[in-house]
Amino acid sequence: MAIISETSDDGSHGGVPNKKPEELHKNPKEDDHQEEEVENHPPIPRQIPQALIRRTVALIKRCHYPSLSLLSKAFRIVISSPELHQTRSSLNLTEPVLYALIGFPPHSFPNWFILNHNITRNIPLRLSAIGSLPPMNPGSAVVTIGYKMYVIGGLIGPNNPVKTVFVIDCRVHTCNYLPTMHRARYRAVAEVINGKIYVIGGCEKRYDDWIEVFDVVTGIWSTVPDRSHFMSSLPGGGFVTSVVMQNKIYILDATCGLVYDPIDGTWESGELGTTLKSYWYKPCCVIEDLLYSFDPYCLQGSPINVYDPNVMVWTPMMGTGIRAFPDLDYFECKMANFGGKLMVFGATYNNPVTDTWCIEMALIKGETGPILGMIDSMVPVLRSVYSPYIDLCRSVTF
């Protein structure tokens, strides 16, 4: 509850208030009667109900929440409450929020940045560093559920992977450690299926614990036996990247594409894996069960290709906006699903500074023909002296 104070505004300064001439002729009994009526009124509440605070805060744009949480304990309690997320959802006020993990090797480890997308006062779109979050371990896997990001494994030194897992609350930019995994992992696959986090690889394969599952409700890790012959071809057991389509985990290995169905514990590769890998590169994301990936070589005439798992075919994304891209290094770009729009992050190098660009694209799908990409915005959002490495970008909703 937030405490408010009452103040006196009777116009007196310690003495008897001056009366107007007409007040001198009033009947004192009338004044007594009015005082009795006032005394019978319910007292003014000295506390604002949490429900009222919550509904008021729900109307405020989420970009102000981290600053608002610093004002008082009452605001921190409301902003970090699950009820606020439920209130915003019921009012259809939830917003996608985009985070990027960017480092400047060898000068700094990757740090989290937030994209200020709907900021007020005509401040341009920009990436802002989040000082309250610690640097991330290289090679961590990151998944999102609602307004939370789960950071899994990574390296804390040369050849020293860790079992640690922590969760970031994006509403107030705080993090808390969770129970550790059974295995230490580096560049593992981590994806969410039916509200559970599946972690695959990132370590040498052992049949009994190469796959682990985290139940976010109970906070318990469990292992999934896997006696298949599928494994990573990379040293240390890591993978290039992964996505989820049709409740299956699609994995890009250095030599092939793999598909894991966690419901029945089966794997697919073969012809599917060959077709899947033909235009799949690390910069990728899934929007409405379609896989979007950069093709640095533009082999199909477009820098972005789209994979449909229903027909197992890659098609180039078209649109005049794609030809307007700045001179990005496509190998180092990153993609994200931003509320159904395609977000692209990439850098251009203009000595002595480097600009990191954000390109927001609306997707137009017809009954037939290729998907069209229309640019909504294309602006530099971060300028730096050192060359950035964009490790990943993720969107959350709150």
From Swiss-Prot:
Mapped Kelch repeat ranges: 148-195, 196-241, 243-289, 295-342
Region described as Disordered: 1-46
Record-linked PANTHER family: F-BOX DOMAIN-CONTAINING PROTEIN (PTHR24414:SF65), F-BOX/KELCH-REPEAT PROTEIN SKIP4 (PTHR24414)
Sorted UniProt keywords: Kelch repeat, Repeat
Protein name: Putative F-box/kelch-repeat protein At2g29780
Protein's UniProt keywords contain Repeat: yes
Record-annotated disulphide pairs: none
Domain F-box: 43-90
The keyword Translocase belongs to this UniProt entry's keyword annotation: no
Composition bias, Basic and acidic residues: 19-32
Database matches in InterPro entries: F-box/kelch-repeat_ARATH, Kelch-typ_b-propeller, Kelch_1
